[in-house]
Amino acid sequence: MSESVRIVACPTCKAEVRWEPQSRYRPFCSERCRLIDLGQWASESYRVPAEEDHPPGETPPTH
């Protein structure tokens, strides 16, 4: 029984990438795209949204 190989889009350039162990840089298509993505995180171009611990308009507590 053969399984079909899943194809995903590279997050950086949108090229098709086979999702399999032989795809060295998955989900990226290449080391270049992987490093571009890493650089975006390092320069804070990408951010994970965070919720404020205090209501809007209220001054945050100081320690």
From Swiss-Prot:
Quaternary context: Interacts with GyrB.
A Gene Ontology molecular function term of the record: zinc ion binding
Domain of life: Bacteria
Protein's organism: Chromobacterium violaceum (strain ATCC 12472 / DSM 30191 / JCM 1249 / CCUG 213 / NBRC 12614 / NCIMB 9131 / NCTC 9757 / MK)
Pfam families per UniProt: YacG
Cofactors, names only: Zn(2+)
Function: Inhibits all the catalytic activities of DNA gyrase by preventing its interaction with DNA. Acts by binding directly to the C-terminal domain of GyrB, which probably disrupts DNA binding by the gyrase.
Record text on cofactor binding: Binds 1 zinc ion.
Protein name: DNA gyrase inhibitor YacG
